[in-house]
Amino acid sequence: MDKKEHIAIFTTASLPWLTGTAVNPLFRAAYLAKSGERDVTLVIPWLSLKDQRLVYPNNITFASPSEHEKYICQWLEERVGFTSGFSIQFYPGKFSRDKRSILAVGDISEIIPDKVADIAVLEEPEHLTWYHHGKRWKTKFRLVIGIIHTNYLEYVKREKNGVMQAFLLKYLNNWVVSIYCHKVIRLSAATQDYTGSIICNVHGVNPKFLEIGKKKREQQQKGEHAFTKGAYFIGKMIWSKGYKELLQLLKDHEKELSALEVDLFGSGEDSDEVQKAAEKLELAVRVHPARDHADALFHDYKLFLNPSTTDVVCTTTAEALAMGKIVVCANHPSNDFFKQFPNCWTYDDDDGFVKLTLKALAEQPAQPTDAQRHDLSWEAATKRFLKAADLDKPLERKLSRTTSNFLAASLNLQEKVDEASAYVHHVASGFEVSRRIFGAIPDSLQPDEELRKELGLTDASTK
């Protein structure tokens, strides 16, 4: 009997922080493990109590990794409806205030023992390897797959000296990803390009949204008014997440859109400014605190307006389509996957936005087919992932006779180049001074005593 594949999924965030790299890898782990054909381990950051208070909402904290794991499993099972068959491991992490993200501490590849190391999935591989100092990922794992979630270049461009920073970051990202990943999957063309990468949306939606959409379709089939509310937008309330573009569009076209009423839902650093900008409009634009998108409050809205172009693949757009709503969004690479759905309407300019918004207010959403609904599911996303990663067929371990000598020589040369490049990165990431120059958290080369104690780490614990 063949040994089961073991897939270790490493990611950069964890619940209760409801960010994409906390939620999507969690669902990926659950659905990869669901069939029982493979062993799956989700490896997530553990934060000290001080950092938990900075990151997690509603004053939620955990005294131990086991308590944190229990919370995650309960949250997941409430949404997928089945008991998850994967395991959870924690790596030491620290929260970077200036980057607003969690960075790994020490060599996190050690969390997976060498004897079971097989396939690694790095969710945000650039983020996970910027400061990696330890065993080379490609050496430890038979196959390393990087999934690109975020366009860091766009975020960096908004900072001081952003153009120069983005230029340097582009080459740093290309360098570390090529060193540490065999395959690279980009969620959309809205990310940085990587040599040999493929574009594939390997994310699905929370099953709750598909259930909501199913009920709405049943109402439509009975001739009932399934959607009794107008337009809304939901997202973290910062200008760069679509609020700037949306409020500008509404301001510039108040006369044409005089019949439009819009509800905005979100919380964030720019909440007060968004509120003030909305109050200046003649249109009825109401601002509300953040709510769960699956809340019954949203079920009856007919139109989701989303002009954001900073996302790689917008989760809320997928959720709105799953609920059977019309989505009016920008004609942008981040929305390419959604164009296949009849309720996704894309615009190229202001006139297109106005025309489609008025059209949506006057019409009812199309009833999605079962196949279209399935394409939004995590079952379909998991199949796309397995195919994109070449995990849907047995690994070819032997080269053909006609090409083996040539390919072996080429691969050997490439391996030597990679090893030399990885050695340079290993040396540079091993000095505190060079680490700080490139933005690492001070004293993050090894976990401190507090993190080691909380995680029960010893020098031999992961060998």
UniProtKB/Swiss-Prot annotation:
SUPFAM superfamilies listed in its UniProt record: UDP-Glycosyltransferase/glycogen phosphorylase
InterPro entries according to UniProt: DGDG1/2 (IPR044525), Glyco_trans_1 (IPR001296)
Protein family (similarity comment): Belongs to the glycosyltransferase group 1 family. Glycosyltransferase 4 subfamily.
Keyword set, alphabetical order: Chloroplast, Glycosyltransferase, Membrane, Nodulation, Plastid, Plastid outer membrane, Signal, Transferase
Compartment annotation: Plastid, Chloroplast outer membrane; Plastid outer membrane
Name of the gene this protein is made from: DGD2
Record organism: Glycine max
GO MF entries: digalactosyldiacylglycerol synthase activity; UDP-galactosyltransferase activity
Main location: plastid
Pfam families: Glycos_transf_1
Catalytic activity field: a 1,2-diacyl-3-O-(beta-D-galactosyl)-sn-glycerol + UDP-alpha-D-galactose = a 1,2-diacyl-3-O-[alpha-D-galactosyl-(1->6)-beta-D-galactosyl]-sn-glycerol + UDP + H(+)
Assigned EC number: 2.4.1.241
Name of the featured protein: Digalactosyldiacylglycerol synthase 2, chloroplastic
CDD domains per UniProt: Glycosyltransferase_GTB-type (cd01635)
A GO CC term assigned to this protein in UniProt: chloroplast outer membrane
PANTHER family, A to Z: DIGALACTOSYLDIACYLGLYCEROL SYNTHASE 2, CHLOROPLASTIC
Stated induction or repression of this protein's expression: Up-regulated in leaves by phosphate deficiency.
GO biological process: galactolipid biosynthetic process; nodulation
Protein function: Involved in the synthesis of diacylglycerol galactolipids that are specifically found in thylakoid and in nodule peribacteroid membranes. Specific for alpha-glycosidic linkages.
Tissue: Expressed in leaves, roots and nodules.
